[in-house]
Amino acid sequence: MIHHKEKMISPEMVTLDGISYPCYRCNTLVVGTGAAGFNAADTLYSLGQEDVFLLTEGIGMGTSRNTGSDKQTYYKLTLAGDGSDSVQEMAQTLFDGGSMHGDIALVEAAMSARCFFKLVNLGVPFPHNRMGEYVGYKTDHDPRQRATSCGPLTSKYMTEGLERSVMQKDIPIFSGYRVVELVTDGEGTEKKVAGLIAIDAATGEQVLFSATS
């Protein structure tokens, strides 16, 4: 099923290794409609890359929407109180955990507040005080109060807010497709992913998606 209000999206037929496939083309293809997938497509669109598709086995599936715990924690820069914090300090904390490269830790810390307030603006009910400070608490190995939570359904609220934003932008969503193979182009060090093949669950048909990224 293709979710797109403005127009029908029709495939072209292409032949790959002697097999004909219906083919959809776009600049950027995002696989998955959890919080990360919805956010990737939504952010790309907001930054000017509007030729983007979302591909998923099912919009209502996925860990972000369907999992819970006693307290799901969202980690961000400290945004309340009189304690000090900085991008560099948060990046160092992430790096010191031993499972993240330093450059990735720095980017995650630098984008932390921006990404958090995007979710706030989309209606995710993170707790705040009457002065507008988004209060936090300490988690394991955290020297600051960077953690926050909406309770056991935090990631569900995040996914729902991001889904609403994607739907408002009318980004095409191909739902009911299972990815089975990546399609590559080039050889050796020049080899790169050029698309993928997915199974349409409704028909059992193999469908090719061609993308620049």
Set out the residue ranges of the language-model regions.
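Long alpha-helical scaffolds
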Residues: 44, 178-179, 210
